[in-house]
């Protein structure tokens, strides 16, 4: 599948200073304070008075920063390593991405505790809506002019802002929980949908609208997800997605786990992604520490990541076809997933949540006989994909339910922060494995599947083709697995080689400290994004020179994908919404974190 109107994406240039020159020419060098980081992009602090003007300039500049990739905050009050940075009790960052430049820039603004106010940027990027709501929810920072600034992760009745440093991180620091009848009634009432609060009318000129709760326990909602539909008969007039039911405070947990002990928590972000979740985190930590991993580590990581891309896509394929009415294929795709998990379990020791990647390497070397297991799977799956394509994906009913349904173009996808197959189905050839290679992906031969209609059918077909390309990558890993160590020889990777601990007391002492306290990472900031199973996933880490992260920001692809739903589905039928939800490919743990 190819697109005839694909955007040209230039080679990636880390820490591209061209935009800094443009900003200095427009606003003057004195308007910015540059921050040295290991994020791989320019990081510039601006004054609040100029924030919106600067962001508007970047949105409208030649080869614009069309995507607000991320927006969130940091409680700076306990941060000790801030030399050269503007005084701040809190800060908010705006991570902007330009596909046409293939580069990023981060704009930061400082705030004092007594004046936590910023202008909304929802008029510049529509997807700022949820991000600003989350910043208010987590930090209590107000965004003037926001259309509906309210809780998004926490319940409406929640008190406090959890990502503030003075907010407890442990349940034992709270009073014992009790649910009285009065409190239960209050919680139930707070969940009642109020159309007027969202600018919706209960009546039209000639009709009364019905408001329908789809979820949070509907099978087609794919998790604890609620979407309130405003209906005129079967037609969707408007809708309001409601998330947060699966929120576990993953970013708060990261502040009280050592750099190593947080790895198992990453598995549970996209709980179908397995080690794919480990990868951006360990790469970001390795940037902080300046760790270079052996080539064998890169190849092993890529091989296992592509295995989990396949298992995730197989589950998507089976459940997607099931969503539109065909029951049989899901049993076949789950059988194929089991074959993949047999290989994964043999290599890592676990199935869904191996927590197998390590800072500086992987947990252990490949086991004896791994190559035969991988070879058998590589030979098996292509024939199965051919069968799925012929028997299910060419089915006239499935095509009728999905072709032309829930379509959007590249411009709309970028404005809403859509990545992954949802973006490439519009013809935009942006896959980080090609556009910004990491972990040695530049050494592999594979194609980036594209489509051009941007509808529910194209999103499915792109993922099917991605599985074929993953097989190509795994086959190259099988044929070209390097010799050598499975972890870096670096003092911040644990544990060190056992024979060295038996000979050198300093090595043993260092090992003891790192196991008991955890490794101490240099004070700095780092960032890593990867092409995960559902789109671009990234970790933005702030170290204050300690054994734990000062701030861990987890940006997941499913979050903006759900925010986009109302703009795509208005005017469609309820049945079309079911097909659309299935085509997004999301899990709520990835959305809610």
Swiss-Prot record:
InterPro entries: NADH_DH_suC, NADH_DH_suCD, NADH_Q_OxRdtase_suD, NADH_quin_OxRdtase_su_C/D-like, NADH_UbQ_OxRdtase_30kDa_su, NADH_UbQ_OxRdtase_49kDa_CS, NDH1_su_D/H, NiFe-Hase_large. Its main location: membrane. Keywords: Cell inner membrane, Cell membrane, Membrane, Multifunctional enzyme, NAD, Quinone, Translocase, Transport, Ubiquinone. PROSITE patterns: COMPLEX1_49K (PS00535). It is found in: Cell inner membrane. Residues 208-593 are annotated as: NADH dehydrogenase I subunit D. GO terms for cellular component: NADH dehydrogenase complex; plasma membrane. Pfam families: Complex1_30kDa, Complex1_49kDa. Its EC number is 7.1.1.-. SUPFAM superfamilies: HydB/Nqo4-like (SSF56762), Nqo5-like (SSF143243). One of its GO terms (molecular function) is quinone binding. NDH-1 is composed of 13 different subunits. Subunits NuoB, CD, E, F, and G constitute the peripheral sector of the complex. In the N-terminal section; belongs to the complex I 30 kDa subunit family. In the C-terminal section; belongs to the complex I 49 kDa subunit family. NDH-1 shuttles electrons from NADH, via FMN and iron-sulfur (Fe-S) centers, to quinones in the respiratory chain. The immediate electron acceptor for the enzyme in this species is believed to be ubiquinone. Couples the redox reaction to proton translocation (for every two electrons transferred, four hydrogen ions are translocated across the cytoplasmic membrane), and thus conserves the redox energy in a proton gradient. This is NADH-quinone oxidoreductase subunit C/D.
């Amino acid at each position: 599948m190819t697109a005839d109107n694909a955007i040209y994406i230039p080679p990636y240039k880390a820490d591209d200073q061209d935009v800094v020159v443009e900003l200095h020419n427009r606003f003057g060098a004195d308007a910015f304070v540059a921050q040295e980081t290991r994020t791989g992009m320019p990081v510039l602090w601006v004054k609040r008075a100029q924030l919106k003007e600067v962001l508007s300039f970047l949105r409208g500049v030649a080869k614009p920063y069309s995507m607000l990739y991320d927006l969130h905050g940091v409680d700076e009050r306990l941060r000790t390593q801030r030399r050269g940075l503007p005084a701040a009790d809190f800060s908010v960052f705006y991570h902007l991405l330009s596909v046409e430049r293939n580069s990023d820039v981060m704009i930061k603004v400082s705030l004092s505790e007594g004046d936590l106010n910023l202008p909304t940027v929802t008029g510049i990027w529509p997807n700022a809506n949820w991000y600003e709501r989350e910043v208010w929810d987590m930090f209590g920072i107000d965004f003037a002019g926001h259309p509906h600034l309210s809780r998004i992760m926490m319940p409406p009745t929640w008190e406090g802002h959890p990502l503030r440093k003075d907010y407890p991180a442990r349940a034992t620091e709270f009073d014992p929980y009790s649910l009285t009848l009065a409190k239960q009634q209050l919680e139930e009432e707070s969940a009642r949908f109020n159309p007027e609060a969202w600018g919706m009318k209960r009546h039209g000129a000639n009709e009364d609208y019905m408001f329908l709760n789809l979820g949070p326990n509907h099978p087609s909602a794919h998790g604890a997800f609620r979407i309130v539909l405003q209906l005129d008969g079967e037609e969707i007039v408007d809708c309001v997605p409601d998330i947060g039911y699966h929120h576990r405070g993953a970013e708060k947990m990261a502040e009280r786990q050592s750099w190593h002990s947080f790895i198992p928590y990453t598995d549970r972000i996209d709980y179908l992604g397995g080690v794919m979740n480990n990868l951006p985190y360990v790469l970001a930590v390795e940037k902080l520490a300046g760790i270079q991993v052996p080539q064998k580590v890169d190849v092993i990581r890529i091989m296992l990541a592509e295995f989990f891309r396949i298992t995730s896509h197989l589950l998507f394929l089976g459940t997607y076809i099931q969503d539109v009415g065909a029951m049989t294929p899901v049993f076949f795709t789950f059988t194929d997933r089991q074959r993949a998990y047999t290989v994964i379990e043999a290599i890592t020791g676990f199935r869904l949540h191996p927590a197998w990647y390590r800072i500086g390497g992987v947990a252990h070397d490949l086991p004896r006989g791994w190559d035969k297991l991988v070879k058998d799977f590589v030979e098996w799956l292509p024939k199965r994909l051919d069968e799925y394509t012929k028997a299910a994906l060419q089915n006239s009913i499935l095509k009728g339910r999905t072709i032309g349904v829930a379509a959007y173009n590249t411009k709309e996808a970028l404005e809403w922060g859509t990545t992954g197959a949802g973006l490439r189905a519009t013809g935009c050839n942006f896959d980080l494995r090609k556009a910004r290679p990491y972990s040695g992906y530049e050494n592999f031969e594979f194609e980036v599947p594209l489509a051009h209609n941007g509808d529910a059918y194209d999103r499915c077909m792109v993922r099917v083709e991605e599985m074929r390309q993953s097989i190509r990558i795994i086959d190259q890993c099988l044929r070209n697995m390097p010799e050598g160590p499975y972890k870096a020889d670096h003092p911040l990777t644990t544990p060190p080689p056992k024979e060295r601990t038996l000979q050198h007391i300093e090595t043993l002492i260092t090992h003891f400290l790192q196991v008991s306290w955890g490794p101490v990472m240099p004070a700095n900031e780092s960032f890593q994004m990867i092409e995960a199973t559902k789109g671009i996933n990234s970790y933005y880490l702030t170290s204050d020179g300690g054994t734990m992260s000062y701030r861990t920001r987890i940006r997941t692809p499913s979050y903006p994908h759900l925010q986009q739903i109302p703009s795509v589905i208005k005017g469609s039928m309820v049945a079309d919404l079911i097909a659309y939800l299935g085509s997004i490919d999301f899990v709520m743990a990835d959305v809610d974190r």
